[in-house]
Amino acid sequence: MIDDQRRGARPGAMLITGAGRGIGAATALAAARSGHDLVLNYSRDGQAVRGVAESIRAMGRKAHIIQADVGQAGDVQRMFNEIENEVGALYALVNNAGITGPIGPFMDTADATIEQVFRVNVLGAMQCAREALANFGRHGTRGVIVNISSIAARTGSPGEYVHYAASKAALEAFTLGLAKEVAAEGIRVCGLAPGSTLTGIHAAAGEPDRPARIAPKIPLGRLAEPAEIAEAIVWLTSPSASYITGTTLACAGGL
């Protein structure tokens, strides 16, 4: 059994990329409610992430904000340098930042879109994971990495964003391989694959009405709320999930 002390907050902070809105913001708030300090990464919307930070601080937890585009290697390095200098130890990384590009058939998808999606969703997550592992090593932390995938990795999303689905499938393969590589160090690497969730990602992809269109195809008959996904992510970082690694958990309403 897991005792109450192990269920509590752990030393070090949780870094969430793309923490200003949607699943990232909901995860930050859920983690704060569980007693954790946060490092909140954002790329563009500083006002949104400052609002999340204010809510976290109102709960009595720390929130450190860092602007960085995880699709740029230099930004990732700068972010982790700042974490080392200003925050110190991490105990968890949530690789949440991700983009889809416009919705449409693969043949209509520009090369630049495909490259940018892979740069953020795959290379950015890999670089953040590598820097987080270095932080764990410096501080002697048996940390946790949670990579946010998508149910699209398993459905393929034909006619919508095959390139995005492929990027998330790559992320799931990375999750499995890295988990096996670092398991002997007591470090866990997990994934979570949300289904369609009520966030701004649909409008950003050019189809704000997509939630209403796809809800009937989901066995539970509705899209997820960001808070539902967030609770699963925070659970994966907790001692309650201490024997789970290398697995990507589907949280997709039955898809």
Task: Please annotate each region the language model reported.
Residues 91, 107-126, 146, 171, ...:
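Catalytic Tyr-X3-Lys loop
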Residues 126, 222-251:
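C-terminal substrate-recognition "lid" of short-chain dehydrogenase/reductases
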Residues 129, 167:
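Active-site helix of classical SDR
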Residues 77, 100-115, 138, 159-163, ...:
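Conserved mid-core segment of classical short-chain dehydrogenase/reductases
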Residues 134, 176, 180-181, 242:
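Alpha-helical segment proximal to the catalytic Tyr-Lys
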Residues 150:
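Residue(s) in the substrate-gating loop at a strand-loop-helix junction
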Residues 183, 188, 244-246:
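Short, small/polar-rich loop/turn modules that mediate ligand/substrate recognition or access, typified
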Residues 20-22:
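Conserved glycine-rich cofactor-binding loop
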